[in-house]
């Protein structure tokens, strides 16, 4: 779990398989990820899969820097990459737009010229202009000739098309998004375009693909649902304050169950609790166990992406919470209390990649159920997960 500031970046590694899930900001790659990938490459290892869970600057900045630095897939300046999962507009629609009228072209050009958000590179010495005018993720994947969504990027990664990807020592199972959630993202894009004055049919080409990605990088900054609504002194429960997240980009997150070398991980990206709950209940009805070896909590520990109902179905001895608290005050203390205050025959460990007011507060919390837990802050070194330590 990398120190990705308010973002996400995870590298999962076994003797046979390496998976990078999101990349935080470009500074996350420059300062941390790049070194680890070069060490893997020196051992003749590759990235078997790179998952970009959804379009958000705090998840994709480091991946953009990786692909820009790595060059063509045949050149691989840093490391060989076998497959990249990323749902761009190219992956979501088959309607090709070959030409645009001048007034619609102006709308697309304006979105592209705005570039990436200013905070896209959080490294103070990084040139802001180059960060904002840099290539989009979709452009870099396509130009680099990478295997994209198992083929050429024209297929989406969703529960309706891709359920499982196999590796030598395990698999990745897709839990979200559904095709319906991806359709909602397209609808949100269409609504944005109409608001900007775009009048023609909404299709896809390289410029429109770029505009799609850049638009959602910016739109994700606009709304932070519910933060700072609950006073720290209220001590309200998650049941009292939980409301479902309604972000179309978060709803498009690629959430997965990853099984490698006998270890089961639940990686929830920024996914919606209701979508995850539906899938895990379906799997549970088929006889699958919903006890994992580790769970990456959704959306940096937000109260609005992990419901009490979901917590009643899933559990693990290890929880990963990725946030420095710099935006939206994540993680939320109500969620942290709800995680640890459940009866269990084992001790839970909460791993935070930073020390935040909430991580310090939860240290002193006394679970009413008598459940025991440990808090590990600044947990950015390798975390070894072994089956013997699990339940």
Regions found by a protein language model. Name each.
Residues 5-8, 259-261, 271-292, 309-313, ...:
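C-terminal regulatory/interaction regions
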Residues 6-8, 26-28, 55-61, 91-92, ...:
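Active-site environment of divalent metal-dependent phosphoester hydrolases
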Residues 19-50, 64-73, 184-190, 196-206, ...:
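Pre-active-site segment of Zn-dependent metallo-hydrolases
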